[in-house]
Regions:
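Glycine-rich ATP phosphate-binding loop
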Residues: 16-40
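Short beta-strand micro-motifs within the conserved protein kinase catalytic domain, predominantly
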Residues: 64-79
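Structural motif in protein kinase domains
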Residues: 86-96
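Activation segment signature within eukaryotic-like protein kinase domains
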Residues: 111-112
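Catalytic-loop of the protein kinase fold
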Residues: 123-140
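Activation segment
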Residues: 152-154
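Terminal C-lobe "cap" of eukaryotic-type protein kinase domains
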Residues: 246-251, 255-270
């Protein structure tokens, strides 16, 4: 596709985002695309995003990738990914611009449902987003949710050995307990982050009130503390969040199950909160409905710096037998007290808007 770069929208640690216009269009036409660009020498994250978006292009709740190209600008070779333009902006901006910095419940329900549809499609196709948060949720012209920023996304893994190779990635305020304590970032981690997003939409505040990363990771990873459920939410909303904020990822509801929850489901799709017909007496590794949750046996008994997005934190120490540190506390200690150089704490939230 032959295109020209327009006005810069903003820039972050990965590079910059600008409007893009096809050469065949008049410059007076409203832009229908944006271009995400980074130096060709450090474009692996952007390339990963393009590959994954190509596989997820059939979902209306996921930002559409139009194409990619290389350009030479100001003596530098750039890698560019062309994306559809979400004219409604980021959901985080909508929240900030609302009257009391929170959304009415009918909008929370609408956006939660759209987000769930996108997450379900991502998971069904074998991927984990790894960085679900308000700034990465865009709104189209029709106010429809568009999940964006797949730079940290990865294939969902199926073996223990693969999980041991997982880096700590994402945004601390949205990280799941299993991500912090064991380095597991599979589909349940996206559901935990979804709960954080819903709580934030309902209150205007992050799910965790903590500005210190070390303290935040300790709170998420150790003990029984959970994010606070907003009092102003309906009983359906509170129950929805309780299904997202389950410490054990095996017992956390899946996107498919949550789509049938009364908080987001249409009347014909709703499963009653009091319906116990689907409970199972015996363990099952694959829940067949939202209420099929046996008692699995498990071995696991504010806004400032904590909002930074981490692409690669220090990996947990692997012992000769391939196991993690001997306890979650040791792993968290390694993360917060034995950091590698700051250059390895790559942040995606260094975004600066210029318009």
């Amino acid at each position: 596709m032959d295109w020209v770069r327009g006005e810069t929208v903003g820039h972050g640690s990965f590079g910059k985002v600008s409007f893009a216009i096809q050469r065949s269009q008049s410059t007076l036409v409203s832009p229908s695309m944006v271009v995400k660009s980074s130096s060709a020498s450090s474009s692996s994250t952007l390339m990963n995003e393009k590959i994954i978006l190509n596989e997820l292009k059939e979902c209306p709740q996921i930002i559409n990738c139009v194409g990619d190209s290389y350009t030479y600008e100001n003596g530098e070779k750039l890698y560019n990914v062309l994306l559809e333009y979400a004219s409604g902006g980021a959901l985080s901006d909508k929240l900030k611009n609302s009257g009391d910095h929170r959304l009415p419940e009918f909008e929370v329900r609408k956006y939660a449902k759209g987000l769930l549809k996108g997450i379900h499609y991502i998971h069904k196709n074998g991927y984990v987003h790894c960085d679900i948060k308000l700034p990465n949720i865009l709104l189209g012209e029709d106010d429809q949710v568009k999940i964006a920023d797949f730079g940290l996304a990865k294939r969902s893994e199926s073996t223990k050995d693969d999980k041991l190779r997982c880096e700590l990635r994402g945004t601390p305020l949205y990280m799941s307990p299993e991500m912090v304590t064991r380095g597991e970032q599979e589909t349940p981690a996206d559901i935990w982050a979804l709960g954080c997003v819903v709580a934030e939409m309902a209150t205007g505040n992050p799910a965790w009130r903590c500005s210190d990363i070390a303290k935040l990771l300790m709170t998420i990873g150790l003990g029984d503390q959970l994010p606070e459920i907003p009092e102003k939410l309906s009983e359906e909303g509170k129950d929805f969040l309780e299904k997202c904020f389950v410490k054990d990822p095996k017992k956390r509801w899946t996107a498919e199950m949550l789509l049938k929850h009364p908080f987001v489901a249409d009347q014909d799709d709703t499963v009653s909160l009091n319906d116990e017909r689907c409970y199972s007496e015996t363990p099952s590794t694959s829940p067949k409905c939202p209420f099929d949750f046996p008692d699995w046996v498990t071995n696991d008994s504010a806004e400032s710096s904590a909002t930074c997005s981490i692409t690669s934190l220090p990996s947990p120490a692997n012992f000769s037998d391939g196991s993690w540190s001997t306890s979650p506390a040791e792993r968290i200690w390694e993360l917060v007290c034995e950091r590698k150089p700051e250059s390895e704490w790559s942040t995606a939230d260094g975004w600066v808007s210029v318009r």
